[in-house]
Amino acid sequence: MKKQIILSACLFAAGTLSAQYQIDLKNISYPKVEYIKMGNPGPAGQEIKVNNLYLTEGGVPQVPVMGEFHYSRMDPRYWRDALLKMKSSGVNIVATYCLWSLHEEFEGELSWKDHLNLHRFVELCKEVGLKVHLRIGSYCNAEIRNGGLPDWIVGNHNFRARSNDPLYLEYVRRWYEAVYSQVKGMMYKDGGPVIAVQLENEYVVSGQIIPHLTALKRMAVEIGYDVPMYTMTHWLDSEYPKGEIIPYAGFYIEAPWTTSGKNEVPVSNFEFFTYNRLSDNIGTDIIKIEGDVESLSGENNESPFFTCEVGVGSTTFYPRRAVVPEELAGENINLRLGCGANLMGYYMYVGGSNPVGQKRTYQSSGPRISYDYQAPVREFGTLGTVMQETKKYNYFMNDFGPSLAPAVAYLPTSNQKRENLQWAVRTDGKSGYLFCSNILYRRHRQDFKNVRFTVKLKDETLRIPRQRITVSDKAYFLWPFNQSLGKTLLKYATVQPVCSMKEGNETTYFFFEDDGIAGEYFLSAEGIDKVETVHAACKKEKNGWFINALRPGKDCVVTLNCTDGSIVRLVTLTEEESDQLWKGTNNGEDYVILTTSSLISDGKKITLIDEQSSAEAWIYGKGQFKKRTFQGEPRSLKATFRQLAPMDGAKAIRSVAGDLVCRGFYLNTIAEVEKAWLRYVADKQSYSMLNNQKVQAEEMGGYWRADVTDLVKAGGNEWAFSAPDGVMAELEILLSNGQRVIWNTDATWTSSDKQSVVTDCNLNKPSIFAEQEHLALYAVNVPDALQGDEETRAYLSYKGDVANAYLNGALIGDSYYDGTDWILSPSRWKESAAVNPLIVRIQGLKSADEPIYFEKDIHPADCVNPSLTGVEIRQEYRFPM
C-alpha cells in the first residue's frame, strides 16, 4: 500500500509539472487587425501605418527599436558619434525631448544655438539613417526642473499650467510653433526623418486626460505636425483618446523613485509575464481567459502594445546609488517582448549632461550636471554594461521583427502564481517564439527541474526540448519555433536567435547557448538536401533533422544545403561571444563582427573604438570567422593632483595701524547664493563683519568657520575683519547656477583708513579641512586632450558622498558616489585644465548611517572622510577596418 501511495504521488507530481509547462492554443482566436487613422503615412512604398497590434513599414510588419537621446544634454560635436553608436547597436528611431526651459530660460528669449540646435540634430539623424520621434511637451519630466516647463510658466498665476486653460494653451501654441519652425519640411511625408510626435508626458489628471490631450493634438495638427504617429505616455490610468493618440507604456525595474533608504526596490508585476501594461490592477480590460490561457481581448484591444520608457539603465537619485548589472537589460527586454510589446522604446539610450542656465542648474532629483543614466551609451561616449544584452535583443527585433510583430502573446494562467516558472508564447497560430524568465532583480528564485514545454497549436503539438531540463535561478531566454530560415523550416531550437546575415545565395543565422541549457535544433526535412556540422551531432529522422551535442563557439556551424541550391548556416555562439556581436550594413552588404571594442559604421566604413592601443575583431564570411588585429601608437597621458588646504589661496594680512582690514567685493550674477562659507585663521578676539553684520563663527580646530549664506548678496559686498594680530581667510560661495566663487585675503585689502595691509604676519594655515566639515578639495592638472575624433577621458577614483568638478569656477561635472569610477571628458571642456587646474570638491557623508542605498561592497564608513585616490587618463583609439 505504501509503495502504491508513493507511486500515485509521483504520478500526480509529474502531471502537475506537465500541466504547468503546457499551453493549449488549438482553439484560440486571433484578434482582428484594424488600422488606426493617424497623420500622413509617408512616401509610397515606405508608408508607416499602425494597427491595433503592430506597425508596418512599406506593408511589412516591424518591431521598431527606439532609443532616447536628448540633444540639449550633449556637446553638439559629439551628436554624430552617439547617433552612430545607436544605429550600430540596432536602434532605428531616436526619441528626443524638446525641453522648453532650456530653450527659453527667460520669456521671449528663445535659443536654438549650439547644444539647442534642434534643426541640425534632426538633420544629423537623417544623415545617419535614423528616424526621429519628437517629444515636444510642454511638460516632459526628464528628471529636469519643473519637468521642462520654464520657471516663468510655472510661476505665472494667471493660468493653471498643464490644463485646458485658454491662456495656458496659447503659451503652449507659441512653444509648439517655435519647435515646428525648426523642423518644418522634415516630416516623414516630406522625405524627412520625423515619424512621430508625443504630446505632453505622464498626464494623469483624472477626467482631464482625453480633453487635454485631444486639445494638444488638435493644436499640433493645425500648426503642421503631420506625422504617421501621435503618441502619449499612458501611466496609471486606462483613459486616453482612443483612435486619436497611441498610448505608450514604460517599465523600470531599477526605479529609484519607488523606494527610499536602504531598502531594495519592491518587486513589481513588471518582473513577470503579465498583460497588465500599466500597474498591478489597471489595464485589465484588454485581457480574456480561455481555459488555462490568458490572451488579448480582440474586442477591447484598440491600440498596440508600444513602449517608450523601458529602463535598461537607471538614473541616480541622492538616496539611491544602485549600479545596474548587465542582466537588468536582458530581463526587462525579454519580459516586455514575451508580454507582446511591439515597439521597444528605451529610456535613456544615450546619457548626457545637464546644461547650466544663467540663473540655476536644472536638476530635479539627480545630480546637477550628470545625466549618465548608466545607459547603453554613457555620458561621455563609453559603452555601458547593459549595452551587451541590449544590442543582442535589438538585432533580434531588427531581423526577426516581421515574424515577431504579428505574433500575439499568450500567457499560461500558471504565471499568476508568482512562485511558478514564468513563461509565455507569442504566435500567429502557426509559428512563434517561446519566452521564459526565472529571474528577479536583486532577489533569488528557485531552480525549476524537469521542465519541458508543450505548445498545442491548431495543427500540431510541439514538445520543447526533447529531454527535460533545469531552468536555473537568473535564467531568461527566448526560443523560436516553426520559423522559416530561407527555404527551410526550423521546427524549434533551444538556443536564442540574435540576427541573420545574407551573402548572395547564402544566409547565416546566429544563435547563442545560454543559462546552462544544452542547445538543440530540430529542422523539417522538407527543402534540405544535406546537413553538415562542425562541433555538433546530426541525426536524420523520419520527419526531419535533429542536431544536438553542440559545442558553442565561433566554429560551431551547421550548414544546410537546400534543394533549391541555396545554403543556410546556423552558427551557435557562446554567451560571451554573443555579447561581442555587432551587426549592420556597410556599403550595401551585411556584416557580423565579434569584438570587445566599441564599433560604429556610417554605412561606408566600419571603425573600432577602444581605450587600449590595440584591438582585435573576428569578421564573419562564408561560414567562418577570420581574425584581424589592429595596433595604434601607445599614448601615455598623466594627470597630477594635490590636496588643497583650507584657505589655500589666501594670504595672512594685518592692518598697519592695528585696526580693521576690509575689502569690497562685487558678486556679478543673477543667480542666487545657494551656500556661502567663511573660513579664517585668527585669534579668539578677532571677528568678521560681512555687509555690516557681525559674523558668528564656530571654532573647527585650527580655524574658524561660519555659514554666511544669508549675508552674501548679488552685487556689492563689504567684508571686514577686526584682527590686530592678523588674519587669513577665504569666502567660498556656491551659486544656484553651479558657479563657485572664492574671495581671499591678500595684499589688495586695505586698512580702515585706506592704507595698504602688510603680509608679514605669521599664522598657521591648517593642512586639511576639519573633520566636522566632511570636506576635501583637490587641484587636478589634466593634460590637454588630443585633437580629432579620439576622445580623452579622465577616470577619477574617490570616496565620499557628492563630488563636484569646477573649471575656472564653472561647474562642469558632478557625481553621487556609488563605488564606480567617475568619468569626465577633457575633450569636451571649453578650457584647458593643464595650467589652470580642475578643482574637485568632495563632500563626505555626515555619518555612516545615512539612509542611502549603496551596493553591498561599499562601506559607508569609508565615505565619511572624503578623498580622491587616483586620476587615470585614458586615450581613445579608433581603428578603421
Which role fits each region the language model picked out?
Residues 79-145, 217, 221:
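Aromatic-lined substrate-binding rim segments of carbohydrate-active enzymes
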Residues 20-93, 863, 875:
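N-terminal carbohydrate-binding accessory modules
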Residues 204-225, 233-274, 353-356, 416-422, ...:
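Substrate-binding cleft/loops of secretory-pathway carbohydrate-active enzymes
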Residues 108-116, 138-163, 170, 177, ...:
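Aromatic- and acidic-residue-enriched segments that line the glycan-binding/catalytic groove
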Residues 117-128, 132-134, 157-194:
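An active-site-proximal structural segment forming one wall of the substrate-binding cleft
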Residues 21-24, 39, 387-688, 693-698, ...:
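Non-catalytic C-terminal accessory domains or segments of carbohydrate-active enzymes
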Residues 214-231, 274-363, 428-429, 440:
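Catalytic-core region of carbohydrate-active enzymes that cleave or remodel glycosidic bonds
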Residues 171-236:
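Active-site neighborhood of glycoside hydrolase catalytic domains
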